[in-house]
């Protein structure tokens, strides 16, 4: 908001007015003019309802208009008074009450409504919904941390699956690379299972990390009513030309109008209970010498199930939202010559506006939305694809 004064203020301007008679006499009628230069209608605010989990947003409006005389101009006329001819030069002597300047801008008289261009309104509504449907929204701390853990789980799973696949195919140099081990290592065993067992100091810590990330995800308990937020702001500059009836004047307005839409919603899908029924064995507790080489496939299956659950689309329920319109700008007013006068220099004034109005939106901008899971990152999907393709039997 532009920092206009919140108090009503008067301003003062000097209006020159000098009459010169043909006989050389000069008559100075210059004067000072006071006018209301600032207008701030009362703020409108209301308190939103509260629940234990949520404080609903409330409508709010405020605004300010100011007007400043830039130049009273120079106008002249010829005439006579009691038979004495004269030439007179004067400023216009106009004053604009700031309360009457709202017509220079696309706003209502009390500044609680701003006329937003339809293209801006449509774009803001469409793009905020795109953020929801594409999963591009504020996740909240708990979900953001869980997303980071899911990313770690996927990365480590990819490494393990690729190492397992390379070993199964006899490509031991590549398997060593995936396990971050020395590629020149010499193996004692000639059998695949034996060589894989020799590499347990590479894949066993990796499996332990996978287990840790997996268990961390299954232990996360999100609130049932966890608000998430999507925001989009769109603005444009507009120009307006027009006429005032009093004083007779042209005006040129330039202003910026923006619309900001905020949507609060929550994911209402049961999958965010984190598939707690799934289990995964601690790799440190397994006697690997006693299990078949292919056990790694069975061990990774719950990880695949979790990744599949995390990446599935989830439903959303609308909580509340706000639509905030803001206008800032100015208008230059150029005053015509009064009847019987000619213009040497037009009188000008400048009006400025700064206003905002926030309304509450109780429904989706369009019909309901589905979101892409916040865990649907590329490498998460890669890990899921690897488990499905390379470990299938």
Swiss-Prot record:
A Gene Ontology molecular function term of the record: RNA binding
Pfam families: Phage_mat-A
Subcellular location: Virion
Main localization, broad class: virion
Top-level division of the source organism's lineage: Viruses
Signal peptide: none
InterPro entries hit by this protein: A_protein
GO cellular component: virion component
Post-translational modification summary for this protein: During internalization, MP is proteolytically cleaved into two fragments allowing translation and replication to start.
GO terms for biological process, alphabetical: viral genome circularization; virion attachment to host cell pilus
Residue pairs linked by disulfide bridges in the UniProt entry: none
Keyword line: Host-virus interaction, RNA-binding, Viral attachment to host cell, Viral attachment to host cell pilus, Viral genome circularization, Viral penetration into host cytoplasm, Virion, Virus entry into host cell
Region of interest (Viral RNA-binding), ranges: 26-233
Family: Belongs to the Leviviricetes maturation protein family.
Chain's role: The maturation protein is required for the typical attachment of the phage to the side of the bacterial F-pili. Binds to sequences located toward each end of the genome, hence circularizing it. The RNA genome-maturation protein A complex is released from the capsid upon host receptor binding. Maturation protein A enters the cell along with the viral RNA.
Subunit structure: Interacts with the host pilus.
Protein name, as recorded: Maturation protein A
Organism: Escherichia phage MS2 (Bacteriophage MS2)
Gene behind the chain: A
């Amino acid at each position: 908001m532009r920092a206009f004064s919140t108090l009503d203020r008067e301003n003062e301007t000097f209006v020159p007015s000098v009459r010169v008679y043909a006989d050389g006499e000069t008559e100075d009628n210059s004067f000072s003019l006071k006018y209301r230069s600032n207008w701030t209608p009362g703020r409108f605010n209301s308190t939103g309802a509260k629940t234990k989990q949520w404080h609903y947003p409330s409508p709010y409006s405020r605004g300010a208009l100011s007007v400043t005389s830039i130049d009273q101009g120079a106008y002249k006329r010829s005439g006579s008074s009691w038979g004495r001819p004269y030439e007179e030069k004067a400023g216009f002597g106009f004053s604009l009450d700031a309360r009457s300047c709202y017509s220079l801008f696309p706003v209502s008289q009390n500044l609680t409504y701003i006329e937003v261009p339809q293209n801006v309104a449509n774009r803001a509504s469409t793009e905020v919904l795109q953020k929801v449907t594409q999963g591009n929204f504020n996740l909240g701390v708990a979900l953001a941390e869980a997303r980071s853990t899911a990313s770690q789980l996927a990365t480590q799973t990819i490494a393990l699956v690729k190492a397992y696949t390379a070993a199964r195919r006899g490509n031991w140099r590549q398997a060593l690379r995936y396990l971050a081990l020395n590629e020149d290592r010499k193996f004692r065993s000639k059998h695949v299972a034996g060589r894989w067992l020799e590499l347990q100091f590479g894949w066993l810590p990796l499996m332990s990390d996978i287990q840790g990330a997996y268990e961390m995800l299954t232990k996360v308990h999100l609130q049932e009513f966890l608000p998430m937020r999507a925001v989009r702001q769109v603005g444009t500059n507009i120009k307006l030309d027009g006429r005032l009836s009093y004083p007779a004047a042209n005006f040129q307005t330039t202003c910026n109008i923006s619309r900001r839409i905020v949507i609060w919603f929550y994911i209402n899908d049961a999958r965010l209970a984190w598939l707690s029924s799934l289990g995964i064995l601690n790799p440190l507790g397994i006697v690997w010498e006693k299990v078949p080489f292919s056990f790694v496939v069975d061990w990774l299956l719950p990880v695949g199930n979790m990744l599949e659950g995390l990446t599935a689309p989830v439903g959303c329920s609308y909580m509340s939202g706000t639509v905030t319109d803001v206008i800032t700008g100015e208008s230059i007013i150029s005053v015509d010559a009064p009847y019987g006068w000619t213009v040497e220099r037009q009188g000008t004034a400048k009006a400025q506006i700064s206003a905002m109005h926030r309304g509450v939106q109780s429904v989706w901008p369009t019909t309901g939305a589905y979101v892409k899971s916040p865990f649907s990152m590329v490498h998460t999907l890669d890990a899921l694809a690897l488990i499905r393709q390379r470990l299938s039997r």
